[in-house]
């Protein structure tokens, strides 16, 4: 799903939901994984044809691209959301739009998650999260962004989502 809005100040907001991709990271065995990769290819093609200017991209991209975006890079390397093929597809989208990962621009080195499984009984102690939710800015406005934060504590609320809010400040 892709929803875009042009604001009165000339900023375009793109909100994406990238399909989760099922449980098996194999295009031939898992139609959902194939659909996810095809969707990412369509995103890439869209941004090659429509170069983003004065744009923000937000959403659940269902990919944790960096080793610091998952609780254990080696254990997660064959798990949907952190496989190399997904990471490569997401990087191609990022290159196509010349997007800057605002959250990682602000918080470059530490483990950072926006999602924890409902299956984890003690999600906070085990801390087996993933950073699936992203905020990107087009290169022309990326320097106007900052103050990124992820509200981890929201995951501990009564009846929470498995995702938590991700914020950034954009001064334009």
Predicted segments with their positions:
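Active-site regions of metal-assisted phosphoester/phosphodiester hydrolases
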Residues: 1-172
């Amino acid at each position: 799903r892709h929803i875009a809005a042009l604001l009165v100040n000339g900023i375009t907001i793109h909100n994406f939901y990238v399909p989760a991709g099922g449980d098996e990271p194999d295009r031939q065995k898992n139609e959902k994984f194939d659909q996810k990769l095809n969707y990412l290819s369509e995103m890439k093609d869209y941004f090659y044809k429509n170069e983003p200017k004065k744009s923000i991209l937000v959403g659940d991209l269902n990919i944790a691209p960096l080793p610091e975006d998952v609780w254990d890079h080696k254990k997660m390397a064959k798990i949907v959301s952190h496989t190399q093929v997904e990471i490569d597809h997401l990087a191609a989208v990022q290159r196509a739009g010349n997007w800057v990962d605002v959250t990682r621009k602000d918080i470059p080195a530490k483990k950072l998650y926006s999602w924890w499984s409902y299956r984890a009984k003690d999600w906070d102690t085990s801390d087996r999260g993933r950073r699936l939710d992203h905020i990107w800015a087009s290169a022309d406005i990326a320097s106007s962004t900052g103050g990124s934060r992820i509200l981890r504590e929201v995951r501990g609320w009564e009846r929470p989502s498995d995702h938590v809010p991700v914020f950034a400040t954009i001064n334009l």
